[in-house]
Amino acid sequence: MSLVVMATGGTGGHIYPAVATAKELRGRGYEVALMGQKGGMEEGIAEREGLTFYGVDAGKLARSGQGRPDPRQLLKAGQGLAQARRTLAGLNPAAVVGYGGFASLPGVLAAQSLGIPTILHEQNARLGLTQRLAVRRARAVGTAYDKVIGLDPRKATLVGMPVREERMPRAEALAALGLRDGPITIMVMGGSQGSLYLNQQVPGILWRLFGKVGKLRGKGDSVPPIDLDLRGPHLIENARSREVQVLHATGPRWLAEVQPKVENLPWYHVTGYVDAVAAWSVADLGITRAGTGTLAEAAFHGVPLVMVPLPESAENHQYHNAVAVEQAGAGRVVEQKVLPETLEKVVLECAAPGKRAAMRDAAQKRARPGAAARFADLIEVQLRRAPSPTAHAPTAHD
């Protein structure tokens, strides 16, 4: 059967959609492999998923406003392109599918230089730098958003965001995570690598909001730490329904820093890494970054979000992603540059049952189950359009 190579890497937002689509194509009888950065997290994920992996060097390119490119990164990018050309010329795949991010670029550009058909998947609401470099010669682009800034809509097909479409029964997930049934569960997650900002700010914010006992404030409680109208919709009459518990995935590198901050709060559970399916299956509210993978998983599980976009994200794509979710009524955007008190207010407002229910309904409407299957359909359409030309053997100059 035909071989399809997924060019991906860098972050989970690029890698996991590739893995989901790879599994779908493999189920249809295709041979599938991943190509990404040597030693990158994609290599370990491919191994765990039983996917063949081809590693190449990958260099980060400077974006507009970032100054001149680093010559060392340009050298790595050139080396990676040559390595990818040699590998793909030997494999002669039917197509290469690019998922964005600097680690995908060598595979996609090498395929295009060899005449191998390329298809792209754009996960964000704004076309990324690496995708802009490849889009002109790509056969088609599957998108996670109905409108993508910088992408000709005639070349785009809305397929959604391929994610792990798995759920756990709530009781089973709570038990696996060591959480109780009953309290509102707030999940804090900074993406596949964690978030320094969320790790530094959120524990203090949640302690100020919910105190040592872990309860939302109600009538008769002491003056709240921020200026809120106590007659507002955030008030909760039933004391039991005011209980909260937190599941905070810090990322392995920051676990030791965060743990001491919350060790006296029995309702605040910290872990370096968490099983995402279990976490999303119990979350009633998420405090997260705004990578498209995170937003797609939130929609699939119907979890409302308070989103703090990563300001350094490529082309500020996380902000544009988050705005689209907020406009749909499924979350609230709080920019990192604002005062922590603003984040406190938004979290408390979104924790209220009525607000959470409305946001949950909006999140579920955003979900597009079956995205991996739809993108696989698009790939198959392009494979049937014309046979893959035979890749030429690399020359001495390649």
UniProtKB/Swiss-Prot annotation:
* Database matches in InterPro entries: GlcNAc_MurG, Glyco_trans_28_C, GlycoTrans_28_N
What would you give as a GO molecular function for this chain, any one? undecaprenyldiphospho-muramoylpentapeptide beta-N-acetylglucosaminyltransferase activity
Q: What is its main location?
A: membrane
Subcellular location as annotated: Cell membrane
Q: What is its EC number?
A: 2.4.1.227
First-level EC class:
transferase
Q: Which pathway does it take part in? A: Cell wall biogenesis; peptidoglycan biosynthesis
Protein's membrane topology: Peripheral membrane protein
At which positions is UDP-N-acetyl-alpha-D-glucosamine bound? 11-13, 124, 164, 192, 318
Q: Which GO terms describe its cellular component?
A: plasma membrane
Source superkingdom:
Bacteria
GO biological-process terms attached to the record: carbohydrate metabolic process; cell division; cell wall organization; lipid glycosylation; peptidoglycan biosynthetic process; regulation of cell shape
- Please name the NCBIfam families in this protein's record: murG
Q: What does this protein do?
A: Cell wall formation. Catalyzes the transfer of a GlcNAc subunit on undecaprenyl-pyrophosphoryl-MurNAc-pentapeptide (lipid intermediate I) to form undecaprenyl-pyrophosphoryl-MurNAc-(pentapeptide)GlcNAc (lipid intermediate II).
The protein depicted here goes by the name UDP-N-acetylglucosamine--N-acetylmuramyl-(pentapeptide) pyrophosphoryl-undecaprenol N-acetylglucosamine transferase
Name its species: Deinococcus radiodurans (strain ATCC 13939 / DSM 20539 / JCM 16871 / CCUG 27074 / LMG 4051 / NBRC 15346 / NCIMB 9279 / VKM B-1422 / R1)
